[in-house]
């Protein structure tokens, strides 16, 4: 479950830009094109607040159907940016489908915090930065695999 994977999530200290953004996924989504990157970042900035509001309102009104739909839309919106945030949104969608509304509050709070962080991490984002981050992430993955 995503909540178990992200419960202790913290952005890497002293490593600006590394955190929730998944550079490999984002590079694939924009095809390595700066104009496309800027366009999808603008879409996220425009839509994310509305999606988060819809999720919060649906839960506050205890409307499981609306919550599931809002979480699904949120998941689709963030999937190109963060596999972590998308996984939490997917968990929220699953909880709403099961009618587990009380259990959904911590996920909504996590998504709101992650949403703010994603927007901050997009400031000054460039193809070059993403490529550097993707390389650093690959180096960390190789190091972890080698040390096992």
What is the predicted function of each stretch?
Residues 1-148:
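Two-component system phosphorelay core
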């Amino acid at each position: 479950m995503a909540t178990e994977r992200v419960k202790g999530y913290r952005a890497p200290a002293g490593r600006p830009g590394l955190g929730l953004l998944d550079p490999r996924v984002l590079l694939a989504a924009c095809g390595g094109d700066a104009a496309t990157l800027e366009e999808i970042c603008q879409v996220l900035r425009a839509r994310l607040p509305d999606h988060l509001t819809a999720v919060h309102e649906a839960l506050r009104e205890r409307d499981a159907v609306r919550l599931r739909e809002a979480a699904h839309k949120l998941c689709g919106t963030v999937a190109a940016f963060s596999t972590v945030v998308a996984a939490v949104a997917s968990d929220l969608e699953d909880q709403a489908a099961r009618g587990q509304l009380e259990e959904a509050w911590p996920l909504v709070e996590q998504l709101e915090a992650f949403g703010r962080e994603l927007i901050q991490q997009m400031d000054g984002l460039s193809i070059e930065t993403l490529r550097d981050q993707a390389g650093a992430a690959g180096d960390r993955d190789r190091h972890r695999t080698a040390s096992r």
